[in-house]
């Protein structure tokens, strides 16, 4: 199996294109898995400034076909032309996939370097894929290892110790733009009830803001404020709340958004300035809102440009942890890649042993002598398999697992099956041999 990823982020393309690519992202993995044999598993990581698809293909030759299938599906769901979709994604394979995801999960590839929200988004991406049945075992191990690496970076370095996040930087910008920096005196309207909305509520509370109203186009505001505080808004109460607001924050990314002309009508009788913070990748607020008199619009691009740089020492430490963890993961993955070869060699050896024991039983029956011969042969086979098994692990750790497989085919004529397609163990004969002892070789 081969890991690969398609990556589109704020570092390479504009956020508007990232938003367009991510339209309908929730169904991409399942659609491609059902329609393309080149994709064995897929996990989609979609955040406010990145859209990445991690996949597993049966072999290296299938990666290009897998990429083409994903590009075609994304094009169909987003409405973007296939050539544009294809150009928007960079493709990674093998160890590059591991290094990139580990860096992403640790916050090293974020617009706000060191931010902690991305680690939770990586975890939720895996949970979603598992729920939808699209996460292969290789991808599960990859994402779990990435989450562990993020925890290690948080525990062993000062990266992210300031608690910086996209939300916190946005609120800092809003503070700088306000005539009155005191959040306890501000009226805030939050759009959305997802993870970003939850983080926003927590940070507003930390800054002393108590007058917070929440609107959800899906009707989840009541349940949201029940555990986080604030006032739930419906369609009728939203207009007067926006008219009186000092700040409104978009975190929903829903199909409905606040249009500029609509906001102008609602705010027509208000003399106080309004700061609109749009943290939704697909825009909760019409970009033309920023052209209205008395309205200051902050976007994800504003946050990216204003994000402070982390200290060089913290970055170096975090990068070292990520590099070491990625290398260890790849070594373990390479060791796992020879499991099929080891199983094939054991099966071949056991077939020979079983054939010889059939001859013994045909001559002596299931006698004590036959059992003694069988026991001796099993011990001998276990000893003979020990060195080839150890060498398989050593070669895999050095990236030479293909040499081991080639040697088995050349010396014994053994065809090594792909992981997940191994044939069931051969049936056991009368007076059976207990094969468990060989599994520990």
From Swiss-Prot:
Q: GO molecular function of the protein, one example?
A: glutamyl-tRNA reductase activity
Q: Does the keyword Lyase apply?
A: no
Which SUPFAM superfamilies does the annotation name? Answer: Glutamyl tRNA-reductase catalytic, N-terminal domain, Glutamyl tRNA-reductase dimerization domain, NAD(P)-binding Rossmann-fold domains
Q: Which PROSITE patterns match?
A: GLUTR
Quote the EC number: 1.2.1.70
Which residues are noted in the entry as substrate-binding? 47-50, 110, 115-117, 121
| HAMAP family in alphabetical order | Glu_tRNA_reductase
Q: What else is known?
A: During catalysis, the active site Cys acts as a nucleophile attacking the alpha-carbonyl group of tRNA-bound glutamate with the formation of a thioester intermediate between enzyme and glutamate, and the concomitant release of tRNA(Glu). The thioester intermediate is finally reduced by direct hydride transfer from NADPH, to form the product GSA.
Q: What is this protein called?
A: Glutamyl-tRNA reductase
Its source organism is: Pseudarthrobacter chlorophenolicus (strain ATCC 700700 / DSM 12829 / CIP 107037 / JCM 12360 / KCTC 9906 / NCIMB 13794 / A6)
Query: Which lineage do the record's taxonomy fields give for this organism?
Result: Bacteria, Bacillati, Actinomycetota, Actinomycetes, Micrococcales
């Amino acid at each position: 199996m081969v890991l690969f990823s398609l990556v589109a982020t704020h570092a390479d393309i504009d956020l508007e294109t990232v938003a367009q690519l991510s339209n309908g992202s929730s169904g991409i993995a399942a659609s491609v898995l059902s329609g393309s044999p080149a994709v064995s598993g897929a996990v989609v990581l979609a955040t406010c400034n990145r859209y990445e698809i991690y996949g597993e293909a049966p072999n290296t030759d299938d990666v290009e076909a897998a990429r083409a299938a994903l590009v075609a599906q994304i094009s169909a769901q987003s409405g973007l032309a296939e050539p544009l979709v294809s150009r928007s994604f960079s493709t990674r394979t093998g160890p590059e996939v591991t290094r990139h995801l580990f860096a992403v999960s640790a916050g090293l590839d974020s617009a706000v370097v060191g931010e902690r929200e991305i680690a939770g988004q990586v975890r939720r991406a895996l949970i979603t894929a598992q729920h939808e049945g699209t996460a292969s075992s290789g991808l599960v191990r990859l994402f779990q290892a990435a989450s562990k690496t993020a925890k290690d970076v948080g525990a062993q370095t000062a990266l992210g110790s300031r608690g910086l996040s996209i939300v916190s930087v946005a609120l800092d910008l809003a503070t700088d733009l306000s005539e009155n920096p005191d959040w306890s005196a501000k009226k805030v309207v939050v759009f959305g009830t997802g993870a970003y909305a939850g983080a926003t509520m927590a940070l507003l509370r930390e800054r002393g803001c108590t007058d917070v109203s929440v609107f959800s186009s899906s009707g989840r505001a009541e349940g949201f404020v029940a555990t986080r505080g604030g006032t739930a808004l419906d369609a009728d109460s939203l207009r007067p709340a926006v008219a009186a607001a000092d700040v409104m924050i978009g975190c929903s990314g829903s199909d409905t958004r606040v249009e500029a002309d609509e906001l102008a009508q609602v705010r027509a009788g208000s003399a106080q300035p309004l700061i609109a913070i749009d943290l939704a990748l697909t825009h909760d607020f019409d970009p033309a809102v920023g052209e209205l008199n008395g309205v200051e619009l902050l976007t994800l691009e504003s946050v990216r440009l204003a994000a402070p740089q982390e200290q060089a020492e913290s970055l170096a430490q975090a990068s070292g942890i990520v590099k070491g963890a990625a290398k260890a993961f790849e070594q373990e993955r390479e060791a796992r890649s020879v499991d099929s070869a080891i199983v094939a060699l054991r099966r071949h050896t056991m077939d020979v042993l079983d054939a010889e024991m059939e001859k013994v039983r045909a001559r002596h029956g299931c006698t004590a002598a036959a059992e003694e011969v069988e026991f001796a042969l099993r011990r001998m086979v276990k000893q003979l398999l020990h060195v080839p098994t150890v060498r398989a692990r050593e070669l895999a750790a050095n990236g030479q697992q293909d040499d081991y497989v080639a040697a088995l085919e050349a010396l014994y004529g053994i065809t090594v099956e792909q992981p997940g397609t191994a044939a069931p163990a051969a049936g056991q004969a009368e007076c059976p041999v207990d094969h468990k002892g060989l599994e520990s070789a």
